[in-house]
Amino acid sequence: GYHEIFICEMGARRVGEIKELCDIASPKYGIVTSVGPQHLETFKSIDNIIKTKLELANNLQPGGAAFINADNEYLRDNMPAGAVTYGTREDAAYSAVLKSVSSSGTQFSVRYPDGSIHDFTTQLVGAHNVTNLCGAIAMAHYLDVDDKAIYDGVCRISPVPHRLQLIKKPGMIILDDAYNSNPSGCRAALDTLSRF
């Protein structure tokens, strides 16, 4: 069959691994979602993590674009030239605003670079998921995906088991974030819980 878009995650445990993956996949577009201390054991320093994550932005095909999370201070302070920014900051090219989080999901809006505002609803919960979705929305819009298709896609996304998964039982709601927690993930889960 014919495919228009191939999406893959590029994870790494050492400097140079994302460049190696770029040499194989030859991406034209890339999203860098975050840099944090959760990988310090293998990378030894935040600078090594930043360098490795930005290997994606620095190894895109000509004419491509890097989408960078402007909410992440490490990425913001090391922003590649020409990057398309996204996040909850007002100065991001694609700027998201969280409207509500409940056991039914999350409502938010995204301001596009042309100033238009688009409302979204997702089954995912948590402010961090709004930032992640904003990156996907930014790239989809940049690639001229139809607005309705973007909206419908965001609505259809369902939680991955054990990653801030809401489980509703009679008389209770369970927020299951047991997959592979780290300090920033735990903070995100507690922040989400505090919004209920």
Where are these regions (language model features)?
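Inter-motif core of Ras-like GTPase G domains
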Residues: 20-36
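Alpha-helix C-terminal capping segments
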Residues: 23-24, 138-144, 194-196
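Conserved substrate/cofactor phosphate-moiety recognition/catalytic segment
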Residues: 1
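Acidic, Mg2+-coordinating active-site environments of NTP-dependent enzymes
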Residues: 31-174
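Switch II (G3) loop of P-loop NTPases
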Residues: 4-15, 174-180
